[in-house]
A protein has these predicted regions:
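Short, conserved catalytic-motif segment at the N-terminal edge
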Residues: 42-104, 123-128, 139
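Non-transmembrane alpha-helical segments in soluble domains
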Residues: 52, 56, 116, 130-131, ...
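Short, gly/Ser/Thr-rich active-site loops of penicillin-recognizing serine hydrolases
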Residues: 284, 305, 318-328, 385-404
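Active-site Gly/Thr loop motif
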Residues: 215-293, 319-374
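Active-site-proximal alpha-helical segments within enzyme catalytic domains
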Residues: 153, 163-171, 283, 287-309, ...
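Active-site helix/loop module of the DD-peptidase/beta-lactamase fold
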Residues: 105-106, 120-154, 174-244, 266-267, ...
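Terminal signal-anchor or tail-anchor transmembrane helices
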Residues: 2-33
Length: 404
């Protein structure tokens, strides 16, 4: 009996040692391959020196294999604006102040903001039925769907990764006084008016400043799993579901939107269709937002300082509408949502929330209304998970709240 217990102890010890050995080896491999010791460019207030150090360490430790841009605005003042790395590592093209990248699902926050402006102007209400503005939408049993149902992905209880943008845009065109799309409204009423360099879709002429997207390889998946075991849960939810499940059918994109093919080689990244200018220029208000971190943060700073929205509407969007337990049919996780935004419990005040929207590969937007903070983090070397479990962004977020 004692011998069996000793053998189990030895086996457990071997497994623990193997875990830490594999984790350490993989981390050192990535440091050797991707370590970038150059100092980030830009500036930061002295109060946020720890944030700047966390950003630098992401490159020093090989966690950022391409480039990244971080901007934090507090009370309308830019307190951190840093960038580093490459917009295209294959050609050694450095990330600059003007480099932009695709936002992926962080684009949804922009679509939600544009619709909130229409709510603010009295053009619609979140509780309105969609058919009030779009009668044909009501076919096939959708006649009782509200605007809020669409924004919080309650329609069929699943996350609408791509169709969210087209659904919200369809509503938007029908309530806008000029019948404009979100793309056109954003350009005419926000970007041009306030000097914000942010678009939905990108013209081929502007493509020169766009960062090239790369995907993680299998060894990077392995490293991220060993560094944070929540990652394997996320991957299992996405990849281990039956082939006829909603998650599997959504994951298997057509070739024009290939996102999830991973090469087995350590030094190579896979083909990403969203590097194609013909795809990038499409009006897809769920994923083809184009910006840098500075302009993304500036946009939402204007949203919470009263420039774009009145307090009446702000009060509606800073609190979630879905907080109870529910089974989300794609990710099988009860995300807290509301008005088109995703919410996380506030790091310092458990009665409040951060709101914004994560994006595929660690694109991040978080808004702290209590402290009048906007945090935008964008990169082109996509990570295994979203910003909610992404080590590079989470280390920055922890450093930020230790600095307040």
């Amino acid at each position: 009996m004692e011998q069996n217990g000793f053998l189990k102890f030895k086996l457990a010890l071997i497994l623990v040692l193997a875990y830490f050995t594999a984790s350490t080896i993989l981390q050192w491999l990535f440091i050797l391959q991707y370590q970038l010791s150059t100092l980030p460019k830009g500036f930061y207030d002295d109060q946020f020196e720890a944030v700047a150090e966390a950003f630098r360490q992401n490159f020093e430790k090989g966690l950022e294999r391409e480039g990244a841009h971080l901007t934090i605005i507090q009370n309308g003042k830019v307190v951190v604006n840093l960038w580093n790395g490459y917009s295209d590592s294959e050609s050694l093209r450095e990330w600059t102040q003007n480099t932009k990248t695709i936002l992926f699902s962080t684009t949804k926050a922009i679509a939600a903001l544009c619709l909130a402006i229409q709510v603010d102007r009295g053009r619609l209400s979140y509780d309105d039925l969609v058919v009030k503005y779009w009668p044909k939408y009501g076919q096939y049993g959708k006649h009782l769907t509200t605007i809020e149902d669409v924004l919080t992905h309650k329609l069929f209880h699943l996350y609408h990764a791509l169709t969210f943008g087209w659904l919200v845009d369809g509503i938007f065109r029908r309530v806008d006084e000029k019948g404009r799309s979100i793309k056109t409204f954003l350009q005419e009423e926000i970007a041009d008016k306030y000097g914000i360099g942010i678009t939905v879709g990108l013209t081929k002429q502007e493509f020169k400043n766009l960062a090239r997207i790369t995907q993680p390889g299998l060894l990077e998946y392995a490293r991220d799993i060993l560094m944070d075991l929540r990652v394997i849960t996320m991957l299992a939810i996405i990849y281990a579901q039956p082939s006829n499940s909603l998650a599997a059918r959504i994951r298997i994109h057509s070739s024009w939107l290939l996102l999830n093919f991973v090469k087995i080689y350590f030094f190579e990244n896979d083909t990403v269709a969203l590097n194609d200018p013909n795809i990038i220029e499409l009006n897809m208000p769920a994923i083809t937002g184009i910006s840098d971190a500075f302009n993304l943060a500036k946009l939402f700073s204007l949203a919470i300082d009263g420039t774009l929205l009145t307090n009446r509407t702000l009060k509606q969007i800073i609190q979630p509408t879905i907080v109870n337990w529910h089974l989300e049919k794609v990710f099988l996780y009860p995300f807290v949502k509301g008005r088109g935004f995703f919410f996380e419990k506030h790091p310092l005040n458990r009665n409040s929330y951060l709101f914004g929207h994560p994006g595929y590969g660690c694109q991040a937007l978080d808004i702290d209304f209590d402290n009048k903070l906007v945090i935008a983090y964008l990169s082109n070397g996509l990570k295994t998970g979203s910003s909610k479990i992404c080590k590079t962004y989470q280390s920055i977020l922890r450093s930020l709240y230790r600095s307040l």
